[in-house]
Amino acid sequence: MAVQRRFLYHGEVVAYAARLDQPRLRDVKGAVALPGTGGRVSLLETCDPGALVRFDYAASSVSGERYGEAYETRATCSIEGLDVCGVLRADLLSAVLTSSHVNEHTFHEETVTLKGLWVNGEYRATDSQILTRVRACPTLSKLKAAAAEDDRLKKSLASAGTSFDESGRPRPTSAGDLACHLFDPGSVRFRADGTSYEVFLGEYLVAERQRRLTMLRVEMKPTDAAAPAGGESVEGTVILLELRVNGYTHP
């Protein structure tokens, strides 16, 4: 008897992950992952008020269900009251990413929200027109075709490291990914209290069978200047709100 083919769900949500090398080595992670059989998993987190990265709460969930002929994977996450080292703040990070599979993979960015972003004491407005363009491209092939004709989408892809062929179409990496930023600006750099910060906004990886969204990634390194009296420079990486959805039929 032949082995029965079945669909294996794959969904992951990371609300907060950090690798901090200074002032002391720490790994911090909070994540949920969906079993291959589907179902639903959720997690509600709070954060140590004395930590370098603080938030009021973070809620994460992943689900996998079949609707008729379609296998749907849905990843959801929201973070409220974010504060990174006292220099990066956001009122709300929220995202819902869905993958649907019938004969091919299609994706839908249901919600991608960044509200009340403050960087080193200054309010930073973000433009989400690239998100609107990406939403109109549920498959990799449609995104490639749109990028060849849309200068703003092409600029976003190029700023995230995507290369282009002679005809102006984006060229996926060896892993089959296209990268872009869903917000403009896609990155912000600044220095504060003896630390250099590089903040990446709305990093999005698009492949034929998978999409991954990282809402905020913060890279921190000590500068040559000393930290203020009583303070400490910071070194490490912080990731806030990362979603990944896909799935496949096996064997």
Please describe what each predicted stretch is:
Residues M1-P251:
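Extended, solvent-exposed, non-transmembrane regions
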